[in-house]
């Protein structure tokens, strides 16, 4: 059975994310622990955390991912931003442990002039300074690769893993990969792209996929998500991707838009159809 779910809201209490996931017929999921647009601490009390853990277990929904703040920049050469990013990430991994959540997902961020090599060194350094609780793993996510943002090349992911002492794993975002120039629009392209990822990084360290179609063509570095099968990756590419041997057992988390009358529930059902379930 495919593990597929959506990014759900914690409004009114973190446990509501589980109830929302069940409404969508999702069986795994992702949350923000707080508003991702500001520097803010997760505000989750013990009772809320227990309710979340109990509901997730009762409904069989998991694994879960906490997506880090959009402000976090692991690659930054600026000391103040580095410290804010480190503090934010530490609070995210601690919140994950409290909630019984397995993964914390993070973008590498932008080197903003430090250069690719310097930026990757900076990212590894921040990861090294984290005190990651047992049972929690940091996932580094692939990026669309615009500007000085790193993570758009598989080699960036592999290099950070080589340079950090932490046991990190990875999240591939299909829209980001496509935007960064990794074609996924045909079965042949999916085979080629995933073979390259396996060679450079290794599919055994792929813990999660953000499954999104793309509103823009391959290689544009433009990150705008589309409904599954309705963007430039398209139905053939999405079907090949979700049925690929490297992906079949990996949890799929949707970050698709809610527009044109199509919700997360529609996209989850679409994935199940593409999987023949």
Swiss-Prot record:
It catalyses: Endonucleolytic cleavage to 5'-phosphooligonucleotide end-products. InterPro entries: AP_endonuc_2, AP_endonuc_F2_Zn_BS, Xyl_isomerase-like_sf, Xyl_isomerase-like_TIM-brl. Its EC number is 3.1.21.2. GO terms for biological process: base-excision repair. Disulfide bonds: none annotated. One of its GO terms (molecular function) is DNA-(apurinic or apyrimidinic site) endonuclease activity. Zn(2+) 1 binds at residues 67, 107, 141. Its cofactor is Zn(2+). Keywords: DNA damage, DNA repair, Endonuclease, Hydrolase, Metal-binding, Nuclease, Zinc. Zn(2+) 3 binds at residues 176, 223, 225. Binds 3 Zn(2+) ions. It holds the Pfam family AP_endonuc_2. The keyword Nuclease applies. Zn(2+) 2 binds at residues 141, 173, 210, 255. Endonuclease IV plays a role in DNA repair. It cleaves phosphodiester bonds at apurinic or apyrimidinic (AP) sites, generating a 3'-hydroxyl group and a 5'-terminal sugar phosphate. Belongs to the AP endonuclease 2 family. This is Probable endonuclease 4. The gene is nfo.
